[in-house]
């Protein structure tokens, strides 16, 4: 079984946030191109604990959405626990209204789903004033509960794979307000793994800078001079030091030597410099 540029033994478990049928599970299926052993976690904190305890060898974590932006707490988790990003995957998010078979939308009293899923489908839901919206922990878990308890009059918003897995009927497909809705996921390991440099053309970095004029501009100039393309920059406040920020950046490059040169310069210019991952660029 191959994951990007990494091979993974069949018995390696992968931690996901949510359960089978969730978007995290869908990423595993697309990235692996086949089923894999899954560790289902109710939160991202539990996912990280699972990885650190060696209960799973890999983890899949959502990190950014094209509409909602960065999932900032997940950046902090990766940094705090020194996790390594070994790959990425971009998933088109399609939300579907589903319920037990044989029902019409007019018979649905409540829709249960994750708050983000409800928000992404608000235009459709506003046209269904008879339906009460109920926030839940996970899209797929809601679908599973409807199936297990045979809950009539209750619908879920989840993926097509959840409908298939839990034998639900899709009452309205792709009800998300914005069709071009994509989430970026990263593949994580507990420990660093050596990767052939010819396979690497993207890196995720973290550093801190003194709060003085031109410090960030100088770093960005180095990246530009070394022929790196900045695809993401995210600042995160340092809780213990008010008004000081850590910067998380993603860069792509054609030649690893250019990246190596930039990395050596940034290690001198910035404090607390850290490589969060070096991997293959999968951005569409």
Where are each of the predicted segments found?
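Domain-level signature for soluble enzymes in the chorismate/prephenate branch of the shikimate pathway
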Residues: 2-284
């Amino acid at each position: 079984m191959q994951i990007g540029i990494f091979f993974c033994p069949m018995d390696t478990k992968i931690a996901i946030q949510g359960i089978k049928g969730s978007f995290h599970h869908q990423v595993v299926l697309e990235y692996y191109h086949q089923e894999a052993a899954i560790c289902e976690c109710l939160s991202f904190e539990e996912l990280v604990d699972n990885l650190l305890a060696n209960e799973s060898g890999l983890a899949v974590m959502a990190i950014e959405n094209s509409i909602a932006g960065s999932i900032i707490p997940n950046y902090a988790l990766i940094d705090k626990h020194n996790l390594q990003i070994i790959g990425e995957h971009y998933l088109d998010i399609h939300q579907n209204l589903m319920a037990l078979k044989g029902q019409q939308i007019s018979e649905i009293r409540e829709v249960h789903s994750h708050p983000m899923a409800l928000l992404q489908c608000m235009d459709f839901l506003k046209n269904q004033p008879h339906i009460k919206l109920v926030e839940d922990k996970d899209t797929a878990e809601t679908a599973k509960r409807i199936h297990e308890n045979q809950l009539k009059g209750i619908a879920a918003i989840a993926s097509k794979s959840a409908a298939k897995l839990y034998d639900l009927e899709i009452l309205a497909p792709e009800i998300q307000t914005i069709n071009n809705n994509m989430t970026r996921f990263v593949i994580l390991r507990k420990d660093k793994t050596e990767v052939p440099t010819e396979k690497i053309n993207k890196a995720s970095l973290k550093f801190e800078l003194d709060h003085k004029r031109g410090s960030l501009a100088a770093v960005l100039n180095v990246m530009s001079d070394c022929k790196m393309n900045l695809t993401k920059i995210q600042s995160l406040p340092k809780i213990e030091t008010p008004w000081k920020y850590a910067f998380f950046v993603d860069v792509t490059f054609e030649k690893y030597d250019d990246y190596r040169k930039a990395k050596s310069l940034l290690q001198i210019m910035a404090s607390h410099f850290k490589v969060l991952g070096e991997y293959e660029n999968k951005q569409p």
